[in-house]
Amino acid sequence: QHYSLEWKPG
């Protein structure tokens, strides 16, 4: 699984 470190909830 890969998740962006730039992820921002919204």
From Swiss-Prot:
Main localization of the protein described in the UniProt heading: secreted
PROSITE patterns: GNRH
A molecular-function term among this protein's GO annotations: hormone activity
Positions where Glycine amide occurs in the chain: 10
Keywords, ordered alphabetically: Amidation, Hormone, Pyrrolidone carboxylic acid, Secreted
Superkingdom, taxonomy of origin: Eukaryota
Subcellular location: Secreted
The UniProt record lists the keyword Secreted: yes
Annotated positions of the Pyrrolidone carboxylic acid modification: 1
GO cellular component: extracellular region
Family stated for the protein in its record: Belongs to the GnRH family.
Biological role stated in the UniProt entry: Stimulates the secretion of gonadotropins; it stimulates the secretion of both luteinizing and follicle-stimulating hormones.
Full protein name: Gonadoliberin-1
Organism the protein comes from: Petromyzon marinus (Sea lamprey)
